[in-house]
């Protein structure tokens, strides 16, 4: 049971995609009603957050919001949790003037369904019922008379794959909550947008937490992404391009890219003059003019991005993949 969740008003539900805004609009309308709400959506789409937002916007906002996950309790424990040892001291009674949120409701055992139906059919005061489920495949096992008591106002939440344009906004929001002052390089977003995110917004938050933890500079770079997300990008194209280069060109590009990577990780500028200085004590000595021409090539291939001023040159995710390709071909 959770009776004191973190504040989740509609203002705290982040997103600008039309499908998400429509879900918020419908949810706000539902908050004006006393009828039961059924929220459906995949794992990590924010069912708990929407349920709490509906409660906080409703006339019951000053009363308890109590959440119970029906899939994490045994049959006996769930009955005890909902109705208490003597049938009238459980959370159903405690939430009577507020909202009772039943998560993963289709997983509720048959005996508990019968007792819940009996409580809803009684003449006594009842809580506002909000239910949620991520798995509709077990819906047919739910008793129909109770199903139609709970499934009156239905809200379906969009998956993150349906609103990929919200990924930059959500990522920046999660990073801002990390307690660190972090920026995010624009080259990170295309990589995130190519990932499937089967865990939806929850998985994206986990990725943002990972990036905040491993980042050594003030700006999140593609190499700060979780390995399982970096690994979703296909490196076949870079392998084909590398085969067309001479051995000397491969050595020069490898040196330049590795130098840029190190400078990026340290938060130091990667200008052609600095790269040239680093090359003087190596077998790959390059003048600033030579570095410039090599950087022009790398930029055309999307291996680096060049910026004016202190920011200098940044390596991209494709550039990181190209480093590994060059290393393998030079063994």
Curated annotation (Swiss-Prot):
Short name of one Pfam family: Sigma54_activat
KW ATP-binding (keyword) present: yes
GO cellular component terms, semicolon-separated: protein-DNA complex
Residue ranges of the TM segments: none
GO terms assigned for molecular function: ATP binding; ATP hydrolysis activity; cis-regulatory region sequence-specific DNA binding; DNA-binding transcription activator activity
Residues involved in ATP binding: 95-104
Chain's role: May play a role in cold adaptation.
Upregulating conditions: 8-fold induction by growth at 15 degrees Celsius.
Listed GO biological process terms: phosphorelay signal transduction system; positive regulation of DNA-templated transcription
The protein, known as: Putative sigma L-dependent transcriptional regulator YplP
SMART domains given in the database record: AAA
Origin: domain of life: Bacteria
InterPro entries on file: AAA+_ATPase, P-loop_NTPase, RNase_R_HTH_12, Sigma_54_int, WH-like_DNA-bd_sf
Key words of the record: ATP-binding, Nucleotide-binding, Two-component regulatory system
UniProt KW Transmembrane keyword: no
Boundaries of every Sigma-54 factor interaction domain copy: 12-213
Disruption phenotype: Cells grow much more slowly at 15 degrees Celsius.
């Amino acid at each position: 049971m959770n009776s004191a969740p973190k504040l989740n008003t509609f203002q705290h539900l982040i997103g600008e995609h039309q499908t998400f805004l429509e879900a918020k609009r419908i949810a706000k309308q539902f908050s004006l009603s006393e009828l039961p709400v059924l929220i459906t959506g995949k794992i990590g789409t924010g069912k708990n957050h929407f349920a709490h937002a509906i409660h906080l916007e409703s006339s019951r906002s000053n009363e308890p919001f109590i959440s119970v996950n029906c899939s994490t309790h045994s049959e006996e424990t769930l009955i005890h949790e909902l109705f208490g040892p003597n049938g009238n001291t459980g959370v159903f009674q405690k939430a009577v003037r507020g909202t009772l949120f039943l998560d993963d409701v289709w997983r509720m055992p048959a005996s508990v369904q019968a007792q819940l139906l009996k409580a809803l059919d009684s003449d006594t005061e009842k809580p506002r019922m909000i239910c949620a489920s991520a798995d509709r495949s077990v819906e047919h096992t739910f008793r129909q008379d109770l199903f139609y008591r709970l499934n009156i106002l239905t809200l379906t939440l969009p998956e993150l794959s349906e609103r990929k344009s919200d990924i930059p906004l959500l990522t920046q929001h999660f990073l801002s909550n990390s307690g660190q002052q972090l920026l995010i390089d624009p080259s990170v977003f295309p990589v995130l947008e190519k990932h499937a995110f089967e865990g939806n917004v929850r998985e994206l938050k986990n990725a943002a937490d990972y990036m905040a933890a491993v980042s050594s500079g003030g700006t999140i770079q593609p190499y700060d992404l979780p390995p399982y997300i970096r690994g979703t990008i296909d490196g076949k194209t870079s392998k084909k391009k590398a085969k067309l280069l001479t051995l000397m060109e491969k050595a020069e590009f490898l040196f330049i890219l590795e130098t840029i990577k190190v400078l990026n990780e340290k938060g130091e500028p990667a200008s052609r003059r600095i790269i040239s200085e680093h090359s003087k004590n190596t077998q790959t000595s390059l003048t600033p003019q030579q570095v410039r021409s090599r950087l022009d090539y790398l930029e055309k291939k999307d291996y680096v991005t060049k910026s004016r001023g202190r920011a200098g040159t940044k390596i991209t995710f494709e550039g990181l993949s190209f480093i590994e390709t060059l290393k393998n071909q030079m063994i």
